[in-house]
C-alpha cells in the first residue's frame, strides 16, 4: 500500500483459495455425513469455542476456523496471507484438525493426543473417541496463542 503498510487480507485473497466466508457454520456442521462425523463435528465446535472463546468462521467450503494470523511461507516468502489459528473439518473419511502442530510446543505434545495420522498441515483423526480430549484442548490453546509470522519485507 502507498503508506508502507501491507493489506495482508487482500494479498491472501489473490493467493489463497481458503478464505473466510459468510456461510453458516452451524448449518455446515449439521449437514456433515455420516452421522458420526456430524456428532464429532458438533462436539469439536463446542471444544474449540470453549478453549478459544471465539466464534467459528467457515473458511472456504469446509474448514471451521477460529481466529486468524498472517502467515508467510518459509519456502516462498512471497506466499502470504491470512489463515485460521486453529480449526477443523469434519470430512467424510476423517476429522482434519488444523494448527495443532504449527508451533514447537504443539508438535512436542502431539504424540500424547492418541490415535492420529499427520498430513502436511493438519492432523487426521478417525473419531473423537480415539484421542485424549484434554490433550486436544491443550493443543488448541497452544495454537490459539500463535501470533503473526514476521514480515520479511523491509518496512517503508
Regions found by a protein language model. Give the residues of each.
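Charge-dense, helix-prone N-terminal extensions
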Residues: 1-156
